[in-house]
């Protein structure tokens, strides 16, 4: 059985990948779509990291994360999501971590971009 892991906004919004970090980390190429947005569109919003966190969880496993109890996720008629605790459920949510955890997660994300420098 494989759990479905969700990263709610509360978790991903706590990790911001700043534009200057992105530009530096992808310095190995001039043609990176996110880098181009930051360099040409006067965009300084940074990126929140909820999507990469689920990938890290899939690759690295659960040990780096605090996860909710098991449950069942449902989609409501109004488009909102519900979560019902269930010992037999196949869904779990990542829980927000502290500042040290957020820094560690950002470093993992940044290292993926930096690794590509050595492979080009």
Report residues per predicted region.
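N-terminal acidic, glycine/proline-rich low-complexity segments
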Residues: 1-120
């Amino acid at each position: 059985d494989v759990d479905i892991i969700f990263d709610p906004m509360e978790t991903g919004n706590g990790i911001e990948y700043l534009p200057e970090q992105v530009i530096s980390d992808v310095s190995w190429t001039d043609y990176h779509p996110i880098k181009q947005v930051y360099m040409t569109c006067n965009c300084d919003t940074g990126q929140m990291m909820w999507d990469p966190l689920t990938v890290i969880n899939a690759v690295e496993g659960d040990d780096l994360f605090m996860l909710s109890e098991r449950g069942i996720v449902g989609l409501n008629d109004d488009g909102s999501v519900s979560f019902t605790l269930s010992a037999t459920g196949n869904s779990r949510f990542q829980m927000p971590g502290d500042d040290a955890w957020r820094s560690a997660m950002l470093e993992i994300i940044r290292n993926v971009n930096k690794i590509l420098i050595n492979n080009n």
